[in-house]
Regions:
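Short glycine/proline-enriched turns and hinge-like loops at secondary-structure junctions
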Residues: 71-72, 139-141, 165-170, 183-186, ...
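Short, surface-exposed charged micro-motifs
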Residues: 144-146
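Short Gly/Pro-enriched turn/cap motifs at secondary-structure boundaries
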Residues: 95, 135-138, 162-165, 179-181, ...
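A short core secondary-structure module
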Residues: 153, 157-201
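Helix-loop "lid/cap" segments that line or gate small-molecule binding pockets
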Residues: 98-107
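Alpha-helical interface subdomain recognition
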Residues: 1-90, 107-112, 119, 123, ...
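Flexible, small-/acidic-enriched active-site or ligand-binding loops
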Residues: 142, 195-226
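A short, Trp-centered hydrophobic/proline-enriched beta-strand micro-motif
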Residues: 123-131, 175
Length: 385
């Protein structure tokens, strides 16, 4: 019946709405003021990390049994979305903490969970995820990093590339070949610590966007780790990696969604103030049509992303398709919306005095990492509902 206030199918819960309000207030007060400097100086957003840790928002996905908030997948999406709305680099703190630690949550032993999830939940450590290599990007199963058993230890050698927050994170989930004759079924997952002998990092990449989040190579030179740091059974690492991405592609959708919303919000305010021909440019129909299209695309991306988050939380059988769809669609929307935001500001939008050019640069990576959007379409085609 029309008018029923209890029909919640397409509405987040009151608790989720309250969480969004709290994160937005925090992000605007503690993170937004530093976003331009973080980008300009290409420095890690320490202020954001401090604020997120102080409010237990840096890794809300960690289960309560390991000291975390035990937040659901939609709550994690809201945290990332609202932080990305003001600073995309900062949103990679909660996003990559989930990406790096989810293999442990999904497949790790109880001992591994207790050892590594507790410090993450407390804010004493961050997690990164090491899958890609110089010659193994979209073809991740073609990796060359090797792990060789030596008694009660594994010895790792290889190079991982494009590792987000490398050098800042204390813990790294590393995929390595343990049986080269089995291709993807010969890959295993391990937890490597920054302090392990033989671990080192390359120089930060000089990137178009997300400049505050360091992206580096991780070098593994005879890194000797205890055998109990293997995540799951030998040979299951690639399966764990792919299962992880089913869930975490949604966090990239959330990041893209936040970037797009931030760009729309800024452009909307600008066109109401900017006057030409004696009136605000918001009064011109051409401008209104652009804003309408931007808002429409964002809302469609939001519904797809939130629905995918719900499927992640439930573990629905079509999660692989829905996660890829959310990431692909939301990131394309982010690129379109931020480009339009720059256009709405005209020459001002093209300068660093205004945030929309940064948002446009930040948006581009969401179409690339955790699988390019071309790969997402392959994933979707192979998993059509």
């Amino acid at each position: 019946m029309a008018g029923s206030a209890d029909f919640d199918l397409y509405r987040p819960s009151e608790e989720h709405d309250m969480l969004r309000d709290a994160i937005r207030s925090l992000a605007e007060a503690k993170i937004a003021p530093h976003a331009a400097a973080v980008d300009e100086e290409a420095r890690f957003p320490q202020e954001a990390l401090d604020a997120l840790v102080a409010n237990d928002l840096h890794a809300v996905h960690v289960p309560e049994s390991y000291g975390g908030a035990g937040a659901d997948a939609l709550a994690t999406v809201l945290v990332i979305e609202e932080v990305a709305r003001v600073c995309a680099s900062s949103s990679l703190i909660p996003a990559v903490n989930k990406l790096g630690s989810l293999p442990v949550i999904l497949s790790g032993s109880e001992e591994l969970k207790k050892k590594y999830l507790g410090p993450l939940a407390k804010g004493d450590a961050m997690f990164s995820y090491c899958l890609s290599e110089p010659d193994a990007g979209s073809d991740a199963a073609g990796m060359k990093t090797k792990a060789v058993r030596d008694g009660d230890f594994w010895v790792l050698n290889g190079v991982k590339r494009w590792i987000t927050n490398a050098g800042v994170s204390e813990y790294y989930t590393v995929m390595a070949v343990t049986d080269p004759t089995k291709r993807s079924k010969g890959i295993s997952a391990f937890v490597v610590e920054k302090s392990d002998e033989g671990v080192s990092f390359g120089a930060p990449e000089k990137k178009l966007g997300i400049k505050g989040s360091p992206t580096r190579e991780v070098y593994l030179d005879n890194v000797r780790i205890p055998a109990d740091r293997m995540i799951g059974e030998e040979g299951t690492g690639f399966a764990t990696a792919m299962k992880t991405l089913d869930h975490t592609r949604i966090t990239i959708a959330a990041q893209a969604l936040g970037i797009a919303q931030g760009a729309l919000d800024y452009a909307k305010g600008y066109v109401k103030e900017r006057k030409q021909f004696g009136k605000p440019i918001a009064d011109f129909q051409g401008i209104q049509f652009m804003l309408a299209d931007m808002a429409m695309k964002i809302e469609a991306a939001r519904q797809l992303t939130y629905a995918a988050a719900a499927k992640s939380e439930r573990g629905d059988s079509d999660l692989t398709f829905q996660g890829a769809a959310a990431k692909c669609f939301a990131s394309d929307v982010a690129m379109e919306v931020t480009t339009d935001a720059v256009q709405l500001l005209g020459g001002y939008g093209y300068t660093r005095d205004y945030p929309v050019e940064r948002m446009m640069r930040d948006a581009k990576i969401t179409q690339i990492y955790e699988g390019t959007n071309q790969v997402q379409r392959i994933v979707m085609a192979r998993n059509l509902p």
